[in-house]
Amino acid sequence: MTMQAIGKPHSRVDGRAKVTGGARYAAEFNQPDQLYAVVVGSTVGLGRILRIDAGAVAQMPGVRAVISHLNAPRLAYQPHKGGTDPANGERLHVLQDDQVRFYGQPVAVIVADSLDHAERAAAALAVSYAGETPVVDPLDAKVQPVAPQAGRAGADRSRGDADAAFAAAPVTVEASFDMARENHTPMEPHATIAAWSGDRLTLWSKSQFVVNEQAEIAAIFGMPAANVQVICPFVGGGFGTSLRTWPHVTLAAIAARQVGRPVKLVLTRRQMFHTTGHRPRTLQRVALGATTDGRLTSLIHEGSGETSRYEQFVEALTSTSGFMYSCPNVRTRYRLLPMDTGTPTFMRGPGEASGMYAVESAIDELSYKLGIDPVELRRRNEPAIDEAEKLPFSSRSLMQCYALGAERFGWASRDPRPRAMRDGRLLIGWGVASASYPCFFSPASARVRLLADGSAEVEAASSDMGPGTYTSMTQVAAETLSLPLDKVRFSLGRSDFPATPSHGGSQTMSSVGSAVRAACLAVQAELAKRAVADRRSQLFGASIDSVEWREGRLSRKGDAAAGPSYSELVTGAGGSPVEAGASAARDAAIAKQYSMHAFGAVFVEVSVDPDLGLVRLRRAVGAYGAGRIVNPKLATSQCIGGMVGGLGMALMERTALDPRDGRPVNAHMGDYLVPVNLDVPHLEAHFVEEQDPHVNPLGVKGLGEVALVGMAPAIANAVFHATGKRVRELPIRIENLLDV
Amino acid sequence: MPEETSHIPPAAAAFPPVSRREVLQATAGAVALAALPGGAADSAAAAEAGAAAGHSLRITVNGHAHELAIDPRQSILDVLRERLNLTGTKKGCNQGACGACTILLNGQRVNACLTLAAMHDGAEITTIEGVAQGEALHPLQAAFIEHDGFQCGYCTGGQIMSGLGCIAEGHAGSPAEIKAWMSGNICRCGAYPGIVAAIAQANKAVRS
Amino acid sequence: MIPFTLQKVLTEAEAIAAAGQGGRYIAGGTTLIDLMREEVERPEKLVDINALPIKHIRAEGGDLVIGALARMSEVAAHPETQRLQPLIAETLVEGASPQLRNVASIGGNLLQRCRCPFFRMLDAGCNKRAPGTGCSAIEGLNGGHAILGTSDQCAATHPSDLAVALIALDATMRVTGPGYERSFPVDELFRLPGTTPHLEHTLRPGELIAEIRVPGGPHARRARYLKVRDRSSYEFAVVSAAAALHVEGGIVRDARIACGGVGTRPWRMRAVERALIGKAPDRAAFEAAARQATEGVKPLSGNHYKVELLPRTIVRALEMAGEVA
């Protein structure tokens, strides 16, 4: 039997748990004697707390504690910077002073014996403030843009003389874009159950990065990391909002310590819009210069994004502009707009999604100006190498993506003229855009145990917010060990498992997958070492180099006879599980040799009702060059999910802030619109064959981000094709299209 | 008083009751106003002392009878999750705006978050935990796995309960109909095409 | 949510007596429980009226008669609704979600509170929730707010789709009070905000909606509802229009039009109706008539687009109605 676990469309190994209600999320680990905590958020957008009338509330039924800066413990807040924390600035220190930095900032937490009692008390708590007017609008003249202090992603870059080339170009496009703030809005609200046992703390907590949450909470409380355990086997959607450890986790731990009992704290849906990050609103300007035959001579991309006063959130807003197109003169500039808001955070396709919305829209504008098909325009400017880094791509299949996508979509039959395609009274538009996202590979580790029954247990901290980590890691282990899938049990979501990087940035498959593979090879090596040293083994005395694993059996090289199985070897060695751990990391030399990215091409069809301003997506085809596809079924779901996310970005999602106090006005799932079932038409995801030996040992590139990135500009471009009107803000809504 | 009131959210203006309100002058000339959400903690405290007694509730969940004393404020969702430890029914928004809490209440799909348990004494409730027959998955559950009608899984219980309702109501006749009648269940991961395919398949299986 | 007591009643008399002692009726509760959780609503006593025998749906003569406790889903699916008043069925299905429609009652639908976000946020001024605290929307974000029937105190739209259809169809309602019954047009249920935006309807204390009656007529079959919104479903109307036409001999004899999403109450478009009478039912006539809809509009900073969208929505709804075979 030859095992082929990788590349097969296996159903999710955790599918049964999820369809029977058996998968347990953070808030579902109810503890004995558990109390309930509810956060009270600031009702001013800037200022100082004057008074908290805790006394009246403390007397209310069931209330066990009212904790604010007045009585909260002074916490250590030792320095800590996880990979998902901004490099510059200092995180919010919750309940440590009387300052209000943004609307909704936690100012108190109530603990009570029931959720109803806690909610009632939270609503009744009187807090008075010295309020000031916050600055929350990026267009406000009081906003002082700053250059990001550090980090390559935020640095201004330039090659050639883009401004001179733009001035000299025979054909130019110059346009500005405004993309709304978005909130991740996962289905599962942030939740933490905190339980202290002496000086040890256990947190059942929604997290995409359990080892960082462990380290951060340990730093905040000034305790050894080994005394903090974070558990999170399932994440009910994250999209980035659970990458950082937000203040509510600390609040839950404070509350549990204060009352001496386990405490459950779940944010309300409204609070999900206050303190758990958001995709920053961005303002961008793109200027393109081209020859009349469509060769780019200048690409200028300037952008700015919201950040808080206390941290610099930097995302990859302009980073793709250096390598997507062949162009001798490129200049990018990125600024941050510090305002009185909570710190933004990574949201699916962070930076790339916003930045490529602007650039891919501008390229589309250029295609009309030139009279060149937008796919052809991209082909004419396809670079041979990464011209920003002056490195070859480890692989780049963008043109193959365009070819495949165009064929599946039927792009050739497009009438290029705006407003030329119709269906009855509806205007039909076809649009296209490129997508790209880097191939990250961060150090990761994993552990494998082979049991006497011949099965394997595999562990890594990691997370599975939906892409299918449980399944794909099971496949990697099964393939590496030549075991059937049901002989492998993969566990994740515990901070005492081997450390892994954040479950974000499309790096789980590459990083954790490589670690799982390495650990499987390590446990095989360990078992082989034992076998050749074991007098009872038929392989006793063989040199370690003379044996090899073939389909889960250890044999002498060249000996066709099947050797002992895992079960026989483990049993023969006494029956105790044989365990090995291993780590994986990118070879630093490789990173200096290649530019590594996933690419995609997205084709969409929209209809626009010109009378009513209604845009509806009618179909979409995405083609992706994302390296090896470990599980086509799950990869397809991941891409379709990304397209749906991009649909939301294009046509619905917008967190609106009240300029007077910075409150998110539509902090409600009925008002912050995301696509519903009826909004989603037939969507196709296709993968081009791509073998990339450089990105990581598995040859995978990651899909989560690139799947979303091209969707919004493709839709915006299709809206132009349908209507002849270029809307340069997202989301595009009814009110934008009543004049078409 | 040299107040600049224009920047104050009208919000803070005339409530809570004046007796609880403070108007203070901050050092830099900024205006301070108290905002007491809800107000009237004093009268509420008195009322709550009297309401501590609790309400007796008998419900049948997935065929099992339960009798328990509840706070009349508790939704069926909170009773399931916090009292009966049946956590397959999810709290997504607690506002009737997402569908993650969908259960069958006396055979009909409803949002458990907007349903006061105390108003449903004697009710028969089916949650996602009660759909499979022992080890045997319901055809709709199996179809969700087959068509990968989920990613993170948090909306899935609600989707399946809603899908069962959709099929029972006769609204699963075509993909278009399923989409319209499943639009009360948000899936942020965007697994809608798989959800539609799963319900269409199960509808055929159930009706054949 | 503040604590409350719950009383289940079995008769209308019992219900009215309980209301007389300060009770607040609850049927489906999809609005009330939501707002109680936000502490926007703070009833101390709930009167559960779900056991009252007013769940009927039937034809009486040519009228469709609907008990106030009939559920949205039941009314939408009922053969008599589909036979006599397909507009009611269509309108109901466009509202909320299947789960909510299984629970929400017809009476409660008419009395649902507004969706203005400031109404729901206790730390925002709102004259409707807390009279005298100012309106946060009029000088703030108001893209979803009303352009008709506003005052300087409130601009929240009425969210019900059903009410739009009922007003277009000249439905009446019967209410039961302490020792009496009275009937009146549904149109008279809704108040304008004026200086008292917290008073939304004309029911007297303790009155219970018993029944809705939708008169039949030649217009009833040629009737459609159009709900314009950015999301295809599960969203309140940006603008909506119910349109019913009686066309005979190629001429509009009767027209009933009402709109949602634009008014502080469901808005009957009588001037548009008048402009249609005697005209051929074509797009030109519809467009000319629909121009009447925006007379007297008072757009706010963020909702000028509704002035443009309103007549277009009416035109499309009329076209849809005109296409009904």
Where are the model-predicted features located?
Chain A
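Conserved beta-alpha junction segments in alpha/beta enzyme cores
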Residues: A162-F221, G305, E315, G429-S455, ...
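Conserved beta-strand/loop scaffold segments within soluble protein domains that form the structured core
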Residues: E213, C232-F234, F239-N329
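Extended active-site and interfacial segments that coordinate phosphate-rich ligands
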Residues: V13-A17, A123-V136, Q208, A215, ...
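C-terminal catalytic domains of large/alpha subunits in multi-subunit enzymes
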Residues: Q59-M60, H69-L70, G222-N227, R257-V263, ...
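Flexible, low-hydrophobicity surface segments
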Residues: M1-G151, T172-A175, H248, Q258
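Short acidic, glycine/serine/threonine-rich loops at helix termini
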Residues: A76-K81, A121-A124, Q214-E216, F239-T245, ...
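Glycine-rich loop/linker segments at domain edges
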Residues: K8, D14-A17, T84, A153-T192, ...
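Short Pro/Gly-enriched beta-strand edge/turn motifs at strand-loop
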Residues: H80-G82, A167-E182, L265-M272, R425-S434, ...
